[in-house]
Amino acid sequence: MESYLRKWCLVSVWVLLLGLGFKVKAEPQVPCYFIFGDSLVDNGNNNRLRSIARADYFPYGIDFGGPTGRFSNGRTTVDVLTELLGFDNYIPAYSTVSGQEILQGVNYASAAAGIREETGAQLGQRITFSGQVENYKNTVAQVVEILGDEYTAADYLKRCIYSVGMGSNDYLNNYFMPQFYSTSRQYTPEQYADDLISRYRDQLNALYNYGARKFALVGIGAIGCSPNALAQGSQDGTTCVERINSANRIFNNRLISMVQQLNNAHSDASFTYINAYGAFQDIIANPSAYGFTNTNTACCGIGRNGGQLTCLPGEPPCLNRDEYVFWDAFHPSAAANTAIAKRSYNAQRSSDVYPIDISQLAQL
């Protein structure tokens, strides 16, 4: 009887609170979210660097309340995933995070960054993958200090999600830029992918050694379909550049194999592959299904396909931004980012992820 009355009282209080307009705050699905990557997910880390690769000016952020350093008109994929995971706030950039903010996670991504150290050097300063991992190690030391000891910190960090999206610049701003880099003369596409994956694995093992256990590894998108690639290498301005996409697929296949190997090697961790390439190809092949009318031109850019010069300060963008797959010469629009993020979180097809999607990763 006493138990029944206690339950009845709890239900009554709950109904009363709802009736008075109080909202019960739900906890996020994971305690924290750590992000490693390049301009696709950079949210301001390059703002303070001496770099051409910056997006801290209008019209970037036109649908986000103003420029923040995000290379989009609005949200990036990780912004959407942050919402889907139940966080109240977007994950802060490493360059601005302070105090206990780090407990919800940190975004270390840096525009022009690559797996190889020299990648993107022609654009100026950037935080390479290894540099981002070093910054994470500094964060771990702060987490230990806040939580009191290494055991508590380790238990906390193992429940967080670690999103890694690296490799695009190793092609865009390295391998396919022979005027600045010699890698295309040193390596075949297969050899180059092997080199990248070897370096990638080393950094993932470093993250593992510092507490990371839930990894979402995002494959390279179809770079050969970007307005910049179309402007330079597509005769009709519509057909994707196969030599670039072919190299990207080789890398992605190696990445899938690495996921299998790492899952076999670390029974206490989970690694999953996010097929951004496949999702992107599906959007381009079936644009109307996602509400798009333009798949090959930048909403903000200059020249052929809007891809010869990327979005410049003060340049007026297109008005129907939600109908464009690409925001600028290289980066997806907020609408495309949303579509890709949703498929990463809750896979529509078995080919979207391997072996599990991010919603399942969060539940582990």
From Swiss-Prot:
Keyword Hydrolase in annotation: yes
Keywords for this protein: Apoplast, Hydrolase, Lipid degradation, Lipid metabolism, Secreted, Signal
Top class in the EC scheme: hydrolase
GO biological process: lipid catabolic process; systemic acquired resistance
Enzyme Commission number: 3.1.1.-
A Pfam entry, by short name: Lipase_GDSL
Function: Involved in EDS1-dependent systemic acquired resistance, maybe in phloem-mediated long-distance signaling.
Name this polypeptide is given: GDSL esterase/lipase At1g29660
Organism: Arabidopsis thaliana
Lineage, opening ranks: Eukaryota, Viridiplantae, Streptophyta, Embryophyta, Tracheophyta
